[in-house]
C-alpha cells in the first residue's frame, strides 16, 4: 500500500500542547496551511495521526474520538480497555487456528495476536485503503503466513465465507469510520452469515459504541441470531460495550475449562477476565444451566 509520492506531513499548533502534532498522509508538497484549515473545519476526509511524546493515535476528526491508539514505547500493547476485553475469546478457545477481524484500524488486536498467538492465522479485513496505508506507522507487521490484511468490505467478506462453507474459530468486529460503526455489521444478515462462518465451536465478539437504547436493540438482535447466553461487558470510562456470543458460551460442561483458559491467559499474557466469567456464571444460572 506504499506510495512513493506520499509521505507523512507534520502540522503543529492545532492543539494547545506544544508536544502534540498532527500527521497527514498526503502527496509531497501539499500545503500545511490547507491541511490545518481542512482538519480544523472538519472537511478533511481521511484518517490522520495525532502524536505526542507517549502515544500515536488514529483519528477521523478533532472531536475527541480516537479510532486507534498505540504506545510509542510498546507498539504491540493493548492500550484501550475494550481491546483487552475483546481478547476474552481466549476464555472459550485458548488456541484458535484462525481469527477473522472485521476492521483493522491501527491494528492493535492484529499486532497483539500476531505476537502472542503463534499458532494462529489472523485475517484482518479493512474497507478503507487509507487506513491500511497507515499500517506501517502503527507497526503492523507485513503480511506473512500468520497475518493477512485484506482491503474489502467486511460484511461482504463474511457473506462470501458463509456461502462457500468456509469456517473460522473467532470473529472480532471493531469496524468504525468517521460516522461511527459500519451499518453493515449491525444488520441481521451479517450476524447470520457470521454465525454460519463460525460453525458449531466459534466465538463472535463485537465492540459497540452507541446510545443505550440502540445498543439494547443490537444486543437483542445478536441474541435472536446466536441464542443465549450473550455476554455484555460495559466499559466504565469510554462507553464501549464488548459483546460475546456463540455456542461455546452455552455449554455448561465447558465452564471449568473456561476458568482454566482464563487462568492461562492471565499467567501467560497478563490478561484477566473476572467480569466475563462472573457474567457467564450468572447467565448460566438464570438460564437454568448448571455451572460447577
Segments and roles (model prediction):
Residues 181, 185-188, 208-214, 267, ...:
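Alpha-helical subdomain
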Residues 64-67, 164:
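Short, surface-exposed beta-strand-loop junctions and turns on beta-sheet-rich folds
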Residues 62-64, 177:
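Short, small-residue-rich loop/turn micro-motifs
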Residues 3, 188-254:
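C-terminal substrate-binding/active-site "lid" region of AdoMet-derived donor-dependent transferases
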Residues 2-53, 67-73, 241-292:
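SAM/dcSAM-binding transferase cores
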Residues 119-121, 144-146, 201, 227-229, ...:
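A generic structural signal for alpha->beta connector loops
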Residues 51-61:
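N-terminal glycine-rich anion-binding loops that anchor highly charged ligand groups
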Residues 3-17, 75-196, 238:
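The AdoMet/dcAdoMet-binding core of the Class I SAM-like
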